[in-house]
């Protein structure tokens, strides 16, 4: 179990603690990317909204890769 905390900022500027970086990254990859790039779609989680831009996706990918 990974005890490291990961946070992202929602579209309206609120800080969101990612409960499980593995599931979060997998969902973004499966549903909000095309050819490994953020596709500018909208991801909603627990009332927080995130536009999955290239920068947003890469920042989450960096967090995911840092857990190793």
What do the PLM-derived regions correspond to, one by one?
Residues 2-3, 62-68:
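Short acidic DE-rich linear segments
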Residues 9-61:
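Acidic, low-complexity, intrinsically disordered interaction modules
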């Amino acid at each position: 179990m990974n005890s490291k905390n990961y946070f992202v900022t929602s579209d309206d500027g609120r800080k969101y603690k990612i409960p499980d970086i593995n599931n979060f990254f997998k969902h973004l990859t499966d549903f909000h990317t095309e050819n490994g790039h953020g596709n500018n779609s909208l991801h909603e989680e627990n009332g927080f909204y995130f536009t999955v831009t290239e920068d947003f996706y890469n920042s989450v990918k960096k967090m995911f890769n840092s857990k190793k």
